[in-house]
Amino acid sequence: MATVKAVCVLKGEDPVKEPVKGPVKEPVKGIIYFEQQGNGPVTLSGSITGLTEGKHGFHVHEFGDNTNGCTSAGAHFNPPGKNHGGPQDNERHVGDLGNVIANKEGVAEVCIKDSLISLTGSQSIIGRTMVVHEKEDDLGKGGNDESLKTGNAGSRLACGVVGIAKL
């Protein structure tokens, strides 16, 4: 059974340096590692720093294009054309990985196992963009059209392209 590994370096925009009292907030950044054995689930591990405390939407977006920042990454990766949902839902985008949770220091430790994304084949996320969002993903339960598209997760704080890693 072959093992495939990948990595994603998340980088946020530099914060606006305004004349305010207090420390300047560091940009959001992180490293996420992916591993898949055969056709099994993909395990994601790593950490993200510079977040506000609480939940932040975490998704795979359709394009590996970051030429215009995280906006160039397009919508959530969704080849079957389904509505947005949570990682445990049958009705969800392939790229819907739910939320990461940042502690009071702004650090989110990522430990996710997902059976819908893949590092090979038609559901492969290789060459696509991972995005961490400003707000909590409502998992498609927000009761409005935007919830069924994005989970009302807000702006894109940091992103990076998923690439094959050395075994």
Swiss-Prot record:
Give the Enzyme Commission number: 1.15.1.1
Its top-level enzyme class, in one word, is: oxidoreductase
Q: Where are the sequence repeats?
A: 15-18, 19-22, 23-26, 27-30
Q: How is the cofactor bound?
A: Binds 1 copper ion per subunit. Binds 1 zinc ion per subunit.
Residues that, per the record, bind Zn(2+): H76, H84, H93, D96
Q: Relate the assembly described in the record.
A: Homodimer.
What Gene Ontology molecular-function terms does this entry list? copper ion binding; superoxide dismutase activity
| InterPro entries given in the database record | SOD-like_Cu/Zn_dom_sf (IPR036423), SOD_Cu/Zn_/chaperone (IPR024134), SOD_Cu/Zn_BS (IPR018152), SOD_Cu_Zn_dom (IPR001424)
S-palmitoyl cysteine lipidation sites on this chain? Answer: C8
Q: What residues bear Blocked amino end (Ala) in this entry?
A: A2
What does UniProt give as GO cellular component?
Answer: cytoplasm; nucleus
Q: Which cofactor does it need?
A: Cu cation; Zn(2+)
Q: Which UniProt keywords apply?
A: Antioxidant, Copper, Cytoplasm, Disulfide bond, Lipoprotein, Metal-binding, Nucleus, Oxidoreductase, Palmitate, Repeat, Zinc
Write down what this protein is called. Answer: Superoxide dismutase [Cu-Zn]
The record lists the organism as: Caretta caretta (Loggerhead sea turtle)
Q: Where does Cu cation bind?
A: H59, H61, H76, H133
User: What family does the entry list?
Assistant: Belongs to the Cu-Zn superoxide dismutase family.
Between which residues do disulfide bridges form? C70-C159
Q: Where in the cell is it found?
A: Cytoplasm; Nucleus
Biological role stated in the UniProt entry: Destroys radicals which are normally produced within the cells and which are toxic to biological systems.
Spell out the reaction equation it catalyses: 2 superoxide + 2 H(+) = H2O2 + O2
